[in-house]
From Swiss-Prot:
<comment type="subunit">
    <text>Interacts with ERBB2 phosphorylated on 'Tyr-1249'.</text>
</comment>
<dbReference type="InterPro" id="IPR002737">
    <property type="entry name" value="MEMO1_fam"/>
</dbReference>
<keyword id="KW-0597">Phosphoprotein</keyword>
<comment type="function">
    <text>May control cell migration by relaying extracellular chemotactic signals to the microtubule cytoskeleton. Mediator of ERBB2 signaling. The MEMO1-RHOA-DIAPH1 signaling pathway plays an important role in ERBB2-dependent stabilization of microtubules at the cell cortex. It controls the localization of APC and CLASP2 to the cell membrane, via the regulation of GSK3B activity. In turn, membrane-bound APC allows the localization of the MACF1 to the cell membrane, which is required for microtubule capture and stabilization.</text>
</comment>
<dbReference type="GO" id="GO:0032886">
    <property type="term" value="P:regulation of microtubule-based process"/>
</dbReference>
<dbReference type="GO" id="GO:0042277">
    <property type="term" value="F:peptide binding"/>
</dbReference>
<dbReference type="Pfam" id="PF01875">
    <property type="entry name" value="Memo"/>
</dbReference>
<protein>
    <recommendedName>
        <fullName>Protein MEMO1</fullName>
    </recommendedName>
</protein>
<comment type="similarity">
    <text>Belongs to the MEMO1 family.</text>
</comment>
<feature type="modified residue" description="Phosphotyrosine">
    <location>
        <position position="210"/>
    </location>
</feature>
Amino acid sequence: MSNRVVCREASHAGSWYTASGPQLNAQLEGWLSQVQSTKRPARAIIAPHAGYTYCGSCAAHAYKQVDPSVTRRIFILGPSHHVPLSRCALSSVDIYRTPLYDLRIDQKIYGELWKTGMFERMSLQTDEDEHSIEMHLPYTAKAMESHKDEFTIIPVLVGALSESKEQEFGKLFSKYLADPSNLFVVSSDFCHWGQRFRYSYYDESQGEIYRSIEHLDKMGMSIIEQLDPVSFSNYLKKYHNTICGRHPIGVLLNAITELQKNGMNMSFSFLNYAQSSQCRSWQDSSVSYAAGALTVH
């Protein structure tokens, strides 16, 4: 066995966000400084994974709720955009690079997860092609900078899970969600609307197209706030809203349901909603972003 440390490069730096550490630091600081920390300490957050020019300010609302003094392990659940995956996959590297500083994968937790037989390994190529986890790394590094040598990350690529698989993974992750020193980051954008996304749901009673999109998204967000995985599945079946992180969200909701059965009291609130642009005609397109936090009472 070689002890060579394997790194995942920050493959989207320089395109989806700046590759300059000082510049990135200043941007993140700027966004975070404009936001209140009303839901600290968050046990889980939902935040977007688009280019920072589009969603950086929205994501700040979620990351501001992270308390670095209690957080020791950060589970990052992101959807798979490029490879077909029916389960969940773990990374095959030790270190995730960011322009700020390197993040260490928790090999102990990875070992526990791997032993369940429920996971596969993603190749380095798949890992570096995927942006859904990477877009959370600079924000994670920034939120945790005051304790940067004291935490690890657990990246999990989430496949197109069936409802029963979402339940199984929810049950598995619930014991980790129960621990106050763990934070779950769930990576998801909301509605992808327009011809290029092959999705054009429009409820005329809402007025302009972008208002209809907002109404549709907020319907889904309010179901997530009710912490009800079954209603969330039914909403997706009915409206087919193109929420790319629907499976990571489903896993989180099922983990919460498991803990509620054991008497844990939690609440989830969305803190910000944004759209990349306002659609007014059938030629337009937009992506929606939402940021929220789960707190334990």
